[in-house]
Amino acid sequence: MSKPPSDPPRRPPAAFTYEDEATERHDNGRQAERRRKPESFSENIVVTADEDDPFLNPDKDLSAVPVATPLRRRTSFGKIAAGAFGILLSLGIGLWTDSLIRDLFTRADWLGYLALAVLAVGVLAVLALVIRETSGMMRLAAVQAIKAEAEAAMVETRPAKARAVVARLVTLLSANPETSKGRATLKATEGEVIDPPHLIALAERELLTPLDRKARALIVNASKRVSLVTAVSPRAVVDLLYVLYEAVRLIRAMAELYGGRPGTLGMFRLLRDVLAHLAVTGSIAVGDSLVQQVLGHGLASKLSARLGEGVINGLMTARIGIAAMDLCRPLAFHALKRPGIGDFIGDLTPSMSPRGNTP
């Protein structure tokens, strides 16, 4: 008969030392710090903002078109010389007109009175032209003044300046029926928004959203027309003349859309600012490199020569339209997204857009 198993022997109680794991790790870190060799570091440390960090913002468009700004008006010797010779020429024309009228009175009184009447009509027409050109230049200056005042009002703590800017913007766009809904919204919320940046952002969303949509349609239509004419035109000079015609037409339409309504001199100034911006940023680059840069090497090799030139000129027209939009828009892009060249590629080449690939 087997014996029942006996209980295992019990271990006598003993004392142990417990060391904190965090303290041990901390001590090891201190020892590692003590063992680290001395090093020298440069004091020229450049801190990159989060919004500019390409690792934090991988979708950031690094090739976006720079914002166009008006050129500074500076007095030059050329302007002084042109003004002096203009005054001299005006005096010569005045003396010639006086001599002509005197000779006509000598021949017959009715010829002299007829010349005086014609001169009066011409002077009145010139005065009307000067008034129109001055009004157009003043409206363009008002647009730039509103933009500058809005940028200054956004850093203020009191909403007085922001409300004044919004009031001026409403007055500028009051003749445009597409802003009626936005003006009604701003009037309904008057006094409720007291933060200057939010007030400017509200005005931008309510007043400029429909205008930006129409401006984009203007740019797309002009770019498509330029692409089509370039693809079918027999001569390069025809392409150049039509691109220039569409550029002037697009800039004028953009200025009128945002309340500028420039005259002839105002159009020359806007055209000069746009071309100067494109020349500085290197946006007027015509050749195979632009197609490969924007559309990709594979597609550029498959495009025909005329179609490739049409796409190039269409994209160049789109850049002109974006620059004109920057110059004519009464508020800078803050609450709304600024359009880029990539927004118009799908319209010029539907096969590249997602909707163009869907059956």
UniProtKB/Swiss-Prot annotation:
It comes from the Bacteria. The keyword Cell inner membrane applies. Residues 23-40 have a biased composition (Basic and acidic residues). Its main location: membrane. The keyword Transport does not apply. Belongs to the UPF0283 family. HAMAP family: UPF0283. PANTHER family: UPF0283 MEMBRANE PROTEIN YCJF (PTHR39342:SF1). This is UPF0283 membrane protein Rleg2_1967.
